[in-house]
């Protein structure tokens, strides 16, 4: 089933309709309120005052998504050391996120955007008629809630290091 999903996703990825417009760098990040893998509610305002890496991904338990999540997991202490938080978002439900998080021991919040409202607000919702997913894109949000970086072309193998490097560069530039 996962192989079929991956094949369909790859085959039809260029045909997906894009729902909303992506907010530009320098604009306030669209707000959100969703449940995490443990059923706890999270709001963008909860992260005010903190650097935030928000990564959208298509589907729990699929190869690229698992690679990306595990890379964030393996580098979570580096994010924490510089005062940044990581939040993953997909259209999967809370139960799916719980299984995914437990299986791979993910130590960060994964939010369930079941209706695709947040993915739409960030311009990453893709509608393939049979399924809707969030495309693999990420955003860096500064402590004031402003988008400072948008990653449109994400490689699950290297993305975490790219985000960490960009965060460190931005933070050190602010301290000068």
Which positions does each model-derived feature cover?
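Structural microenvironment flanking redox-active thiols in thiol-disulfide oxidoreductases
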Residues: 66-106, 117-118
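N-proximal helix/coil linker or "cap" segments that precede and/or mark the start of modular domains
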Residues: 5-31
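A short beta-strand-turn-helix
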Residues: 32-51
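Thiol-/selenol-based redox modules, centered on thioredoxin-like
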Residues: 133-176
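Structural micro-motif
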Residues: 106-108, 125-128, 132-139
């Amino acid at each position: 089933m996962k192989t079929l999903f991956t094949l369909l996703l790859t085959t039809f990825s260029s045909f997906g309709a894009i729902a909303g417009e992506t907010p530009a760098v320098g604009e306030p990040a669209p707000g959100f309120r969703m449940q995490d893998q443990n059923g706890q509610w999270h709001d963008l305002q909860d992260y005010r005052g903190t650097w935030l890496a928000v990564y959208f991904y298509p589907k729990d338990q699929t190869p690229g998504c698992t690679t990306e999540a595990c890379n964030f997991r393996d580098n979570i202490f580096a994010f924490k050391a510089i005062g940044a938080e990581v939040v993953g978002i997909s259209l999967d439900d809370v139960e799916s996120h719980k299984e995914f998080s437990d299986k791979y021991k993910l130590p960060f919040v994964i939010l369930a955007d079941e209706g695709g409202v947040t993915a739409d607000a960030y311009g990453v919702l893709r509608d393939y008629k049979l399924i809707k997913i969030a495309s693999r894109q990420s955003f860096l949000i500064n402590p004031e809630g402003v988008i400072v970086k948008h990653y449109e072309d994400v490689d699950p193998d290297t993305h975490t290091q790219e985000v960490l490097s960009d965060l460190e560069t931005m933070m050190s530039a602010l301290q000068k």
